[in-house]
């Protein structure tokens, strides 16, 4: 895993972990795609999904914005998805 991919995964984890009640269930899988972008999959306990999404999706939008901003210096696209 590239250093930037690891940094983005760590950033996403550091933002989500304090939001949830079941941090042991947090799984983050970050990988670089063929086109050079970074894809981050986030899995949390069912009970915590609403906290990560936030009202009207504001929390997950903010997490995506932070991840994209962190990668903007290298013009790398980042996509963060919350999976069931």
Task: List each language-model region with its residue ranges.
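Glycine-centered tight-turn and secondary-structure capping sites
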Residues: 53-57
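RNA-contacting regions in translation and RNA-metabolism proteins
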Residues: 1-49, 62, 66-84
């Amino acid at each position: 895993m590239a250093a930037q991919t690891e940094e983005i995964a760590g950033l996403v984890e550091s933002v989500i972990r304090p939001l949830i009640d079941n941090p042991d269930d947090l799984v983050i899988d970050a990988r670089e795609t063929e086109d050079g972008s970074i894809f981050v999959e986030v899995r949390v306990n069912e009970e915590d999904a609403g906290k990560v999404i936030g009202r009207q999706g504001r929390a997950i939008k903010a997490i995506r914005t932070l991840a994209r901003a962190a990668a903007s210096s290298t013009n790398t696209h980042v996509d963060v998805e919350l999976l069931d």
